[in-house]
């Protein structure tokens, strides 16, 4: 088995390692540990700044440790699982834990969403993957007032799965920085990643911090301070940059917009997702019911270039017939989030993939609503609400929270007629350009104060 795949190893680039060392505010670091040190790049970067500190590294890969012992003999090394019981046999490590504990933990732990275990925290059980269990271990072995600088999957900041855990984390540590790392930083990883800088709280100072800084790190290793969020019980516990930027933009729009703004759920009578054809290829046929996948949803239209049909007689699709005037919205996939189209009135019934949401609406013109969702107002919400590290997705609950600018009915009808006229044109680049121009017209109209 490939050693990288076996141990989920994706080593830290030198520039990122040096950046992580640089943002730690404490100049008086005496002990540093990395429980999954890989090629020990983080500890070597730390050595450049804290030359007189003691460095401790653990890794499960024995071959790597042999190289590290020859290259960086100053590191106290241990071969084993950084979360395993065998650490009890590491004497120098145990001596520090019995004393003041470690000043700094610096880490790029292995990521594996499916390597999950139940962990009890304050009498509450959490199902946590290996990377989050490493974070908990660091909170255990770092001294009060000590720092943890750790790389995690970006989904940790947004997934509902971690919502309560993120709240509990604020009781144990001050989160000084949340930083989204630029795409492509780690070779061989398609997942988005983030960097957290935390400081373990003093037991006698159990206060709740008032705000968290959320920033973006570009490929020049320059930080852009995008936003600072206030922490209170009424704030949705999401720490991802896109969502927090979305909240700020929505507040700005609500203050300036001259038209009513309503939540999408006010107009939705039915919201459903479709079914997958994976493993069901026998259901496809030359004639039957049209099956729509995200690849069929182009810019504000449904492509007919390579149609797929499924059997009319099979019960698998029985309850997901999609009626004309339903709105299709991309549910999952980075390239699909933000896709929208309407099933026009002249379409017969269709069925859809589970990668799509289908909305049936009343009280608002569906053609106008589809156009609105394609504007910057709609797109920033669809993309800002998306969650996850690898494959972004939107939940039904979040989708229904999208805010809709609702002009007068005559305005909705005006844009409806223009949209319908364009939809009857031949599919192609010219039609796509005209649709984009129409969306731009809608945006300019809604931006009027």
Cite the ranges covered by each PLM segment.
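Basic, amphipathic alpha-helical recognition segments used for DNA target recognition
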Residues: 202-204, 298, 348-349, 354-410
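A short beta-sheet element
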Residues: 317-320, 324-373
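Non-catalytic DNA-recognition/assembly elements of restriction-modification systems
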Residues: 220-282, 408-449
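Sequence-specific dsDNA recognition surfaces
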Residues: 265-280, 295-324
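Conserved Class I SAM-dependent methyltransferase catalytic core
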Residues: 62, 127-183, 195
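S-adenosyl-L-methionine
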Residues: 73-94
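Class I S-adenosyl-L-methionine
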Residues: 1-71, 75, 86, 158, ...
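Conserved proline-anchored active-site loop of SAM-dependent methyltransferases
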Residues: 20-23, 32-46, 81-82, 96-119, ...
């Amino acid at each position: 088995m490939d050693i990288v795949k076996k141990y989920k190893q994706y080593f830290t680039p030198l520039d990122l390692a040096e950046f992580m060392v640089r943002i730690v505010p404490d100049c008086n670091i005496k002990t540093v540990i990395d429980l999954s040190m890989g090629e020990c790049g983080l500890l070597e970067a730390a050595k450049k700044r804290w030359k007189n500190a003691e460095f401790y590294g653990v890794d499960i890969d024995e071959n790597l440790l042999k190289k590290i012992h020859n290259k960086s003999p100053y590191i106290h090394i241990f071969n084993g699982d950084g979360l395993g019981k065998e650490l009890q046999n590491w004497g120098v490590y145990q001596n520090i834990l019995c004393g003041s504990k470690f000043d700094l933990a610096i880490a790029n732990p292995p990521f594996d969403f499916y390597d999950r275990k139940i962990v009890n925290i304050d009498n509450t059980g959490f199902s946590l993957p290996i990377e989050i269990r490493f974070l908990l271990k660091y909170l255990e072995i770092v001294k009060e007032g000590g720092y943890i600088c750790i790389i995690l999957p970006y989904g940790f900041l947004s997934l509902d799965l971690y919502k309560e855990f993120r709240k509990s984390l604020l009781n144990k540590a001050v989160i000084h920085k949340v930083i989204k790392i630029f795409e492509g930083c780690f070779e061989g990883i398609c997942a988005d990643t983030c960097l957290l800088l935390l400081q373990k709280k003093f037991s006698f100072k159990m206060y709740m911090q008032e705000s968290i800084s959320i920033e973006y790190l570009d490929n020049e290793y320059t930080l852009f301070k995008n936003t600072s969020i206030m922490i209170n019980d009424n704030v949705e516990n999401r720490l991802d940059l896109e969502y927090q930027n979305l909240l700020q933009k929505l507040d700005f729009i609500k203050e300036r917009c001259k038209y009513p703004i309503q939540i999408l759920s006010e107009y939705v009578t039915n919201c459903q997702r479709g079914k997958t054809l994976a493993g069901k290829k026998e259901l496809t046929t030359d004639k039957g019911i049209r099956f729509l996948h995200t690849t069929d949803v182009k810019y504000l239209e449904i492509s007919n270039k390579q149609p797929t049909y499924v059997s009319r007689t099979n019960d698998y699709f029985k309850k997901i017939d999609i009626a004309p005037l339903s709105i299709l919205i991309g549910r999952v996939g980075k390239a699909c989030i933000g896709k929208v189209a309407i099933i026009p009135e002249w379409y017969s019934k269709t069925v859809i993939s589970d990668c799509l949401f289908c909305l049936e609406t009343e009280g608002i013109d569906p053609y106008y609503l589809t156009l609105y969702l394609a504007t910057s107002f709609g797109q920033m919400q669809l993309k800002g609400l998306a969650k996850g590290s690898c494959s972004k997705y939107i939940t039904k609950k979040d989708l229904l929270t999208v805010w809709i600018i609702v002009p007068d009915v005559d305005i909705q009808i005006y844009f409806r007629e223009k949209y319908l006229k364009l939809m009857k044109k031949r599919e192609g680049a010219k039609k796509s350009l005209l649709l984009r121009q129409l969306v731009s017209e809608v945006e300019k109209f809604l931006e009027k104060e």
